[in-house]
UniProtKB/Swiss-Prot annotation:
One of its GO terms (cellular component) is external side of plasma membrane. The gene is IL7R. This is Interleukin-7 receptor subunit alpha. Receptor for interleukin-7. Also acts as a receptor for thymic stromal lymphopoietin (TSLP). Belongs to the type I cytokine receptor family. Type 4 subfamily. A motif (WSXWS motif) lies at residues 217-221. It comes from Macaca fascicularis. A motif (Box 1 motif) lies at residues 272-280. The IL7 receptor is a heterodimer of IL7R and IL2RG. The TSLP receptor is a heterodimer of CRLF2 and IL7R. Interacts with CD53. GO terms for molecular function: cytokine receptor activity.
Length: 459
């Protein structure tokens, strides 16, 4: 009996193990299955076999135990409520004409008739086109380009006819450096200048739905390989880079020439060739030998005989000369009229209007000295008081005039007398006009005079 009981126990245990592996799990095993991640993804392909559409789903986690798991679609179907998927290794698919393609369908993962997870999906938004085929590359020697052509089965379909294609090409040695070109047609032109010469290239293409239908990229088409030829420039052709540099250089030189012609006289010539003074004067200054023993002295004592005053303006000199030339004749005429009219003054007394003050005479003499008039500097400077007025004119007035004339005549007989004594009246000599000399009557007849001879001796 003991042996028989042990045998039945072993058989029962084996049946439990076999039933668990075959899918007849108990309640505890079902709870463990519910804890797994059964997320999945699906895509649809329209008109894959005539008018039939296909729907393919797969779990996102490849390690999921798919034993006893099944897919079911419900809603947006024609004539039926739900359809079950068929399993092919790790994927689940269904191929039928009963997809309505309007609205959303409910796709669920079930185990033992119980739904584990569900998704609502619109089949028109998960369309995956078929991969392009017949990819080829043709080189056109005359145009120096490559024409890429391919074909797709969607050109003859009713639903998904508008596609966007992605053409990818790379140099064979650059494994991860793909260059992509997107286009809606099935023809592409690659320029030879954009490719490396004598290089092997790999090219492939894929498609994605556009406009109404949305979805995923198709699988890549089989790769196509082509080689670029060597660049042989014909004798008449020129490198584009060299041509560009030549044109830029030509325009730059032309611009510089135009600017030089326009700005030559105003800007460039004064800097490059500055204007020089008259060549005759320049050569005279350069070639003329300096004179020797020049009578040039910077000794301050040489300038003691001639007082130097500052002249701030040329107008001051003109005013003084005009004053001396215009004022004195008028005053002399008035003096004559007064004398002839029998005024109170003595006949031998000169009018006060004729008398020149020492300050004005000094100023005029200094101006003439500055102008280089030696005769003006040599003129005697007379200073006296007017204490001897007209009351003493009858006694020593004529005598003073005669002494003055005698002293001037004895010191420098060559100079014309600046005054003429007519009837005891002192007047200006017309010859000496422009060189007025101050005369005044003074009580002291022993005044010092500076004559031309003493001036030359000092020099």
């Amino acid at each position: 009996m003991t042996i028989l009981g042990t045998t039945f126990g072993m058989v029962f245990s084996l049946l439990q193990v076999v039933s668990g592996e075959s899918g007849y799990a108990q309640n505890g095993d079902l709870e463990d299955a519910e804890l797994d991640d059964y997320s999945f993804s699906c895509y649809s392909q329209l008109e894959v076999n005539g008018s039939q559409h296909s729907l393919t789903c797969a779990f996102e986690d490849p390690d999921v135990n798919t034993t006893n798991l099944e897919f079911e679609i419900c809603g947006a179907l024609v004539e039926v409520k739900c359809l079950s998927f068929r399993k092919l290794q790790e994927i689940y698919f269904i191929e039928t004409k009963k997809f309505l393609l309007i609205g959303k369908s409910n796709i669920c993962v079930k185990v033992g008739g119980k739904s584990l997870t569900c998704k609502k999906i619109d089949l028109t938004t998960i369309v995956k086109p078929e991969a392009p085929f017949d990819l080829s590359v043709i080189y056109r020697e005359g145009a120096n380009d490559f024409v890429v052509t391919f074909n797709t089965s969607h050109l003859q379909k009713k639903y998904v006819k508008v596609l966007m294609h992605d053409v990818a090409y790379r140099q064979e040695k650059d494994e991860n450096k793909w260059m992509h070109v997107n286009l809606s047609s099935t023809k592409l032109t690659l320029l030879q200048r954009n490719l490396q010469p004598e290089a092997m290239y790999e090219i492939k293409v894929r498609s994605i739905p556009d406009h109404y239908f949305k979805g995923f990229w198709s699988e890549w088409s089989p790769s196509y390989y082509f080689r670029t030829p060597e660049i042989n420039n014909s004798p008449g052709e020129m490198d584009p880079i060299l041509l560009t540099i030549s044109l830029l250089s030509f325009f730059s030189v032309a611009l510089l020439v135009i600017l030089a012609c326009v700005l030559w006289k105003k800007r460039i010539k004064p800097i490059v060739w500055p204007s020089l003074p008259d060549h005759k004067k320049t050569l005279e200054h350069l070639c003329k030998k300096p004179r020797k023993n020049l009578n040039v002295s910077f000794n301050p004592e040489s300038f003691l005989d001639c007082q130097i005053h500052r002249v701030d303006d040329i107008q001051a000199r003109d005013e003084v000369e005009g004053f001396l030339q215009d004022t004195f004749p008028q005053q002399l005429e008035e003096s004559k009229k007064q004398r002839l009219g029998g005024d109170v003054q003595s006949p031998s007394c000169p009018s006060e209007d004729v008398v020149i003050t020492p300050e004005s005479f000094e100023r005029d003499s200094s101006l003439r000295c500055l102008a280089g008039n030696v005769s003006a500097c040599d003129a005697p400077i007379l200073s006296s008081s007017r204490s001897l007025d007209c009351r003493e004119s009858g006694k020593n007035g004529p005598h003073v005039y005669q002494d003055l004339l005698l002293s001037l005549g004895t010191t420098n007989s060559t100079l014309p007398p600046p005054f003429s004594l007519q009837s005891g009246i002192l007047t200006l000599n017309p010859v000496a006009q422009g060189q007025p000399i101050l005369t005044s009557l003074g009580s002291n007849q022993e005044e010092a005079y500076v004559t031309m001879s003493s001036f030359y001796q000092n020099q």
